[in-house]
């Protein structure tokens, strides 16, 4: 990742912990499995929005050591750790499904740590926008892995309504310290 500072206008006021906790959706296992088929992670991974451990558990099942933290205490990993306030990385790689409203802030914070790799699961539409274009350029986005099909719906925890598939396209956005050149585009099943 580029060591250049990420000067991104805040896309709204920084949300309070209680609001950020409400933007919690479990990551489908198929999303993490797909990432691991196309990206290698050398060394431990920090999952800074671990929730109940959906990403962490899959990584551990693949033999990847994980440091799991979350702003909200959910009984998995270390709670009450605000990734956006951390002063340094807890592992050489970062993989997470960030709160959507704070995805840009998560990307900029991760870039400030200059990790080996960062992978953020975000809506494909997150790629759009002038300020995000500048952020991607300044932080050295390496690859975008687009899901060919829709991921299973990531319902909010506690959702009691009908289960359904998602109408939203998702992608893994990957920053790689060893990548040079423009971002590459690839597809996942």
Each language-model region and where it sits:
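Class I S-adenosyl-L-methionine-dependent methyltransferase catalytic core
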Residues: 1-189
């Amino acid at each position: 990742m580029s060591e250049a500072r990420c000067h991104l206008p805040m896309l709204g006021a920084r949300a309070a912990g209680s609001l950020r906790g409400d933007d919690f959706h479990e990551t489908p296992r198929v999303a993490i499995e797909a990432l691991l088929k196309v990206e290698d992670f050398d060394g431990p991974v920090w999952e800074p929005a671990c929730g109940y451990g959906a990403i962490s558990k899959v990584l551990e099942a693949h033999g990847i050591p994980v440091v799991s933290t979350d702003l909200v205490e959910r009984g998995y990993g270390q709670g009450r750790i605000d990734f956006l306030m951390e002063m340094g990385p807890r592992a050489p790689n970062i993989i997470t499904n960030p709160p959507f409203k704070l995805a840009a802030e998560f990307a900029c914070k991760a870039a400030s740590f200059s990790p080996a790799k960062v992978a953020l699961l975000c809506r494909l539409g997150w790629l759009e926008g002038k300020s995000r274009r500048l952020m991607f350029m300044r932080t050295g986005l390496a690859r975008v892995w687009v899901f060919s099909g829709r991921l299973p719906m990531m319902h909010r925890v506690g959702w009691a309504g009908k289960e359904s598939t998602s109408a939203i396209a998702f992608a893994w956005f990957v920053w790689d310290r060893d990548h040079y050149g423009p971002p590459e585009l690839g597809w996942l099943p």
